[in-house]
């Protein structure tokens, strides 16, 4: 049987010094024979999705100790993409994912921890911790801080989220008073922003990967039920330790759970629920860390056969994550996919032997269990707060309408093609990604003249100055992992196009990425990126681009001979922006850019460069 990793620092005469230090942290004689379980928390006062996590690590720790483990908590960094957006702060967002992954690896390996509980929530924190878990491959369970409640105002006939505040602020016809009311109402509580944005998408995907508990992605942060998820996560971590160190059960380890089939399940869920395009980037990165051969071609294949069964803000103002929970949460979406023959239900989870077992226990349309039904009735209280578990409001009824409700069955899907698609063509040889759930059907095939910008900043200025007209394809380049560096989110350009009434009349193509709050014909992750010699760097103003989502194609309508001539010219000039950008690129960002791969590889480090 495998020995506890912690024995390296807790056993033997030569570890007397280490034990002395362990004792100084509070360990007693009897603790040196127990598993040491690291708790990677991510509390910060900078991020609403993490502001309530301060005491939750200790909540998990006490439960771990109650059931026979030793708990040791530490914190990672956490960047708020919404606060970092629109200025050079966004250059740090994606690179922070690698820092988070490294910090978890450093702490766990330096102290020889036996298992790991990841307390994550927002955009780069869950992916960073997921990458670390698959690197380390020790028993791991994820538990998130939970989603924010949707906002409410008398000035709108629907619930609000962050994007509503941004769009109204960019609308010149809106009064200052209306903008202020939306600003004060859009984000009422702690938690990750309330739509199907990147944070919530990733927390939902951990359920499909099998690494978190049912409800992880959907119970609002303020609800008392989420406390039980934290307590149970502590117990599960100890159980996983016993299964691995006591029984050498490979399905107690992340790589035994998050297999190729599990990654297909996660991507299938993402497509079905119209998740953020960023999830593709993060799943590809996690797969590389776990040595799972899951790539863009697999995503392309799945996108052609998986229907969209759930539509949530920003793709519709009607539903937010709290409504997904009321409809049965992720387990109910997985149940509909399973009945459609679209899942690998034999995949393992941290809480059941198979995903089929999990669905059988938790799908509200299949289970006659008052406890399960009560759990999924957990709802918002509508009281602004930054305190976790501070309310116990429940819906009177569940939404089990699978023909017209928030979650649909396959026969009544919002669309028979899913919410994400991968496009290929001469402008993106290795692919690019579009969130089809947010694209009006009238522009699924679109041809337009290019309006080229060398940065997000110049694109924003151009859009606000009315340089962009209906029928244009806005191209924003040199914003990829290397070129940015850091692959900025393009939420402001898409929001401003929307506020200008161009959301259904323009396209946007970039080697950068998009916020989970983006909608419209917004195509990102163009690979290779411009800074790596990608054809997006060869586009000129006035060229034509043809986008055909049904055919999964995107092409620059320029002859091969002309493209070859442009490439020769660009090789001589160097692959860098034409204009000088007033952008401070620090040593830390330069180090990230040096090793970063393009988006089709998840923007992870180029290991070939490290291996020489």
Curated annotation (Swiss-Prot):
Pathway(s) this gene product operates in, as recorded in its UniProt entry: Amino-acid biosynthesis; L-isoleucine biosynthesis; L-isoleucine from 2-oxobutanoate: step 3/4; Amino-acid biosynthesis; L-valine biosynthesis; L-valine from pyruvate: step 3/4
Cellular component annotations (GO), alphabetically ordered: cytosol
GO molecular function terms listed in the Swiss-Prot or TrEMBL record: 2 iron, 2 sulfur cluster binding; dihydroxy-acid dehydratase activity; hydro-lyase activity; magnesium ion binding
Gene Ontology BP term (one): L-valine biosynthetic process
Residues modified as N6-carboxylysine: 124
Alphabetic keyword roster: 2Fe-2S, Amino-acid biosynthesis, Branched-chain amino acid biosynthesis, Iron, Iron-sulfur, Lyase, Magnesium, Metal-binding
Annotated [2Fe-2S] cluster binding sites: 122, 193
EC annotation from Swiss-Prot or TrEMBL: 4.2.1.9
InterPro entries documented for this protein: Dihydro-acid_dehy_C, DihydroxyA_deHydtase, DiOHA_6PGluconate_deHydtase_CS, ILV_EDD_C, ILV_EDD_N, IlvD/EDD_N
Annotated positions binding Mg(2+): 81, 123-124, 489
Catalytic residues, chain numbering: 515
CC cofactor: [2Fe-2S] cluster; Mg(2+)
Cofactor: how and how many bound: Binds 1 [2Fe-2S] cluster per subunit. This cluster acts as a Lewis acid cofactor.
Catalytic activity: (2R)-2,3-dihydroxy-3-methylbutanoate = 3-methyl-2-oxobutanoate + H2O; (2R,3R)-2,3-dihydroxy-3-methylpentanoate = (S)-3-methyl-2-oxopentanoate + H2O
Similarity annotation: Belongs to the IlvD/Edd family.
Subunit details: Homodimer.
HAMAP family documented for this protein: IlvD
Its biological purpose: Functions in the biosynthesis of branched-chain amino acids. Catalyzes the dehydration of (2R,3R)-2,3-dihydroxy-3-methylpentanoate (2,3-dihydroxy-3-methylvalerate) into 2-oxo-3-methylpentanoate (2-oxo-3-methylvalerate) and of (2R)-2,3-dihydroxy-3-methylbutanoate (2,3-dihydroxyisovalerate) into 2-oxo-3-methylbutanoate (2-oxoisovalerate), the penultimate precursor to L-isoleucine and L-valine, respectively.
Annotated protein name in UniProt: Dihydroxy-acid dehydratase
Organism encoding this protein: Xanthomonas campestris pv. campestris (strain ATCC 33913 / DSM 3586 / NCPPB 528 / LMG 568 / P 25)
């Amino acid at each position: 049987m495998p020995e506890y990793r912690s024995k390296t620092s807790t056993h033997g005469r030569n570890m007397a010094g280490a034990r002395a230090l362990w004792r100084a942290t509070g360990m007693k004689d009897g603790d040196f024979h127990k598993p040491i379980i690291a708790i990677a928390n991510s509390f910060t006062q900078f991020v609403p999705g993490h502001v309530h996590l301060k005491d939750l690590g200790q909540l998990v720790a006490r439960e771990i100790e109650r059931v026979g483990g030793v708990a040791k908590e530490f914190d990672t960094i956490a960047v708020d993409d919404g606060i970092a957006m629109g200025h050079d702060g966004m250059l740090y967002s994606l690179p922070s994912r690698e820092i988070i992954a490294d910090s978890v690896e450093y702490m766990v390996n330096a102290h020889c921890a036996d298992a790991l509980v990841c307390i994550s929530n927002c955009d780069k924190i869950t992916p960073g911790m997921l990458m670390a878990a698959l690197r380390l491959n020790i028993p791991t369970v994820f538990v998130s801080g939970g989603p924010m409640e949707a906002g409410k105002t008398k000035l709108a006939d629907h619930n609000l989220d962050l994007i509503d505040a941004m769009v109204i602020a960019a609308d010149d016809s809106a009064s200052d008073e209306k903008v202020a009311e939306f600003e004060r109402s859009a984000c009422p509580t702690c938690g990750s922003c309330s739509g199907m944005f990147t944070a919530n998408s990733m927390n939902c995907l951990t359920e499909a990967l099998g690494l978190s508990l049912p409800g992880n992605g959907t119970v609002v942060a303020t609800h008392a039920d989420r406390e039980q998820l934290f307590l149970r996560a502590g117990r599960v971590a100890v159980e996983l330790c016993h299964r691995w160190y006591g029984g050498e059960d490979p399905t107690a380890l992340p790589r035994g759970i998050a297999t190729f089939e599990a990654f297909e399940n996660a991507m299938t869920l993402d497509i079905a629920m119209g998740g953020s395009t960023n999830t593709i980037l993060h799943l590809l990165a996690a797969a590389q860390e776990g040595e799972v051969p899951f790539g863009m071609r697999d995503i392309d294949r799945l996108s052609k056969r998986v229907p969209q069964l759930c539509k949530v803000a920003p793709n519709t103002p009607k539903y937010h994550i709290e409504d997904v929970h009321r409809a049965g949460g992720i387990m109910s979406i997985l149940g509909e996919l399973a009945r459609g023959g679209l899942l690998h239900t034999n995949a393992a989870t941290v809480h059941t032997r198979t995903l089929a077992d999990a669905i059988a226990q938790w799908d509200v349309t299949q289970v006659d269990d008052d406890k399960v039904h009560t759990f999924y009735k957990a709802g918002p209280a509508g009281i602004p707060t930054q305190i976790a578990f501070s309310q116990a409001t429940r819906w009177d009824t569940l939404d089990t309408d699978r023909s017209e409700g928030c979650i649909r069955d396959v026969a009544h899907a919002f669309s028979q093609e899913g919410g994400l698609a991968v496009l290929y063509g001469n402008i993106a040889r290795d692919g690019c990604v579009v969130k089809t759930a947010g694209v009006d059907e009238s522009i699924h095939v679109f041809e337009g003249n290019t309006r080229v910008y060398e940065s997000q900043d110049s694109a924003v200025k151009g859009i606000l100055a009315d340089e962009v007209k209906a029928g244009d394809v806005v191209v924003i380049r040199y914003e990829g992992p290397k070129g940015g560096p850091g692959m900025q989110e393009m939420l402001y350009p898409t929001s401003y196009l929307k506020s200008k009434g161009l959301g259904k009349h323009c396209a946007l193509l970039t080697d950068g990425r998009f916020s989970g709050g983006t909608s419209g014909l917004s195509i990102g992750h163009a690979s290779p990126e411009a800074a790596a010699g990608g054809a997006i760097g060869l586009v000129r103003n006035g060229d034509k681009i043809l986008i055909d989502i049904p055919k999964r194609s995107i092409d620059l309508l320029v002859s091969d001979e002309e493209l070859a001539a442009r490439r020769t010219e660009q090789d001589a000039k160097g692959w860098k922006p034409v204009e000088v950008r007033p952008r401070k690129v620090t040593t830390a960002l330069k180090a990230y850019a040096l090793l970063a791969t393009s988006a089709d590889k998840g923007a992870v480090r180029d290991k070939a460069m490290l291996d020489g």
